[in-house]
Amino acid sequence: MDAVFKALADASRRELLDRLRADNGLTLNELCARLAQAGADMTRQAVSKHLAILEEANLVVTVRRGREKLHYLNPVPIHEIAERWIGKFERSRLQALSDMKRALEKRNE
């Protein structure tokens, strides 16, 4: 899980994930073109380096199609973080809201 947090800590890598979320299954060249259209100033080598870190963290998976390598967003690690860290805190907040709703309903009776 540390690799996922490390990968998500960089704004450039988050931008790459956003691009893949919007248009999954891109080659390196297609991804670079999409980033350039969005105004991101990243070299092909930088994109390649960031993709390698995202692959290590299992946030991006690749599939070979002939000589091309397609990059896909893998949302599972992010979902696991949400379940482990965010979900735990959200449950208690939802319970507090539910308790407050019941208390207000009793008061209005």
What are these regions (language model features)?
Residues 4-7, 11-44, 68-80, 84:
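N-terminal helix-turn-helix DNA-binding core of bacterial DNA-binding proteins
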Residues 55-66, 72:
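Beta-hairpin "wing" of winged helix-turn-helix
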Residues 1-4, 109:
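Short, intrinsically disordered or compositionally biased N-terminal tails of bacterial proteins
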Residues 18, 22, 79-109:
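Amphipathic alpha-helical dimerization/coiled-coil segments
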Residues 51-52:
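Short, hydrophobic-biased segments on the C-terminal half of alpha helices
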